[in-house]
Amino acid sequence: MNSEKPDYNYLFKIVIIGDRKTGKTCLMNRFVENTWSEEYRQTNLLHFKVKTIYIDCKIIKLQIWDSQADENFRFNNNNLSNYRSASGFLVVYDCTNENSFSNLKHWIKDIKLYGRPNAINIVVSNKSDLVNEKVIDSDVAKSYCDSLEIPFIETSSKHSSNVEDCFVLLIKNVMKYLETEPTIPQQQQQQQQQQQQQQQQQQQQQQQQQQQQQQQQQQQQQHQQSSKTKIGCLIQ
């Protein structure tokens, strides 16, 4: 049987994470459906939307997941499977909310702990349209992201400013990684080889220690026999 070829070149799973009320759902809706609502609705169920885009003459199919945040605005176990299978993350904070910016370090740490080794992430400063309410300076945010070597972009889902650009930036970085870095199976193979080498080294060290112990025991036995022989000669 001939299996049908997919109608895309790449399939990427993108997860949007960050504190509550940072506009994660609005970003997804604006990008996928070009809609926006001022009414806040808490994300209680895991859900995703699909969008196909074209980048560098490639057809990219995206699965975009809206994540949950628990009552402490932190990692929720319901998101674990999404973290493990995500190609990239949009880490969103609200530029009018200082706590959401301070919590970036926790979200980025969660990606390292629970995400794939080659997952790509970018930081998104959302609600850039609220100029008079802004409390996080753009230069401060960019400097922080530069120190972590993470791309940074400002968006407004309300005005549709840079919304598409933030997704395209993430996808281009994912594609760049795939072109320049080893795949996950290759990484796993390298890790297995390293583990095997370490095990072999440990076995060799154990064998050497056993040989040394045997030699010491033989020397002790020889010394004891020699002492007994000398004592026997003296008695005679």
Curated annotation (Swiss-Prot):
Instruction: Region Disordered: list its residue ranges.
Output: 192-236
Positions of the propeptide segment: 234-236
Q: Which NCBIfam families did the record assign?
A: small_GTP
What this protein is called in its record is: Ras-related protein RabY
- MF terms in GO: GTP binding; GTPase activity
PANTHER family attached here?
A: RAS-RELATED PROTEIN RAB
Membrane topology qualifier: Lipid-anchor
User: Which species does the entry assign this protein to?
Assistant: Dictyostelium discoideum
The question of whether GTP-binding is a record keyword is answered with yes
Gene3D superfamilies cross-referenced by the UniProt entry: P-loop containing nucleotide triphosphate hydrolases (3.40.50.300)
Taxonomy of origin reads: Eukaryota, Amoebozoa, Evosea, Eumycetozoa, Dictyostelia
Here the segments flagged for biased composition (Low complexity) are 192-225
Family classification: Belongs to the small GTPase superfamily. Rab family.
Among PROSITE patterns, the record links this protein to: RAB (PS51419)
Q: Write one Pfam family the protein is assigned to.
A: Ras
Lipid group attachment sites (S-geranylgeranyl cysteine): C233
Subcellular compartments: Cell membrane
Q: Where does GTP bind?
A: 18-25, 66-70, 126-129
